[in-house]
């Protein structure tokens, strides 16, 4: 009989204890985000400053993240959410929650998982930051020539459309009022001046070659007139020297 009474008392105490534990747990489960609850004091209390609790019923509140150094606040901490950080100007975030800051890539580079990487041949990036390398422009697709080769920082510069002089090719002329009219006029003028200069040089070269050939083939044409002129000049000098003697001789005869 005594043992039975003892067993009943133990069972009653266990039931009472379980009810109390369940009541404590149920009290903490009812706490809202931004609060914490301790088992020995099952009361929902607000998180203190610089702490937060995104889930209610936690025994402690979490410490808010501090954004300093290369970080700045993107979103300030509240009682229910942690602070969000971002990198300062000139840096970019690394990691899913911006755990590290890395300096922005320079023009001619792109950001990869390993950091900043120089653009490969045939690509460029003219942006200062997190831009990606883009392929050079293919000028030949538009029927244009490459005026300036591209670099890792700048794209290819395409020239005016290539003009074909094939009889079967139809040359399209852009009106003067169009965007390419001025460029086409300049190109036409340049080609005309170049052609005229080449023709003039060819003509002068041929002229000198012909004169040189004639002078070598017929040297008397250039030398004979000079000889005749020299001989005539000598005869005139001789005559001018003899004439006074004849006059003197005649004068002497009259005196006798």
Curated annotation (Swiss-Prot):
Gene Ontology CC: external side of plasma membrane
UniProt-listed GO biological process terms: apoptotic process; negative regulation of cell population proliferation; regulation of immature T cell proliferation in thymus
Membrane topology classification: Single-pass type I membrane protein
Glycan attachment residues as annotated in the record: 128, 138
Organism whose genome encodes this protein: Mus musculus (Mouse)
Function of the molecule: Receptor for TNFSF9/4-1BBL. Conveys a signal that enhances CD8(+) T-cell survival, cytotoxicity, and mitochondrial activity, thereby promoting immunity against viruses and tumors.
Name of the protein this chain belongs to: Tumor necrosis factor receptor superfamily member 9
Membrane-spanning ranges: 188-208
GO molecular function annotation: signaling receptor activity
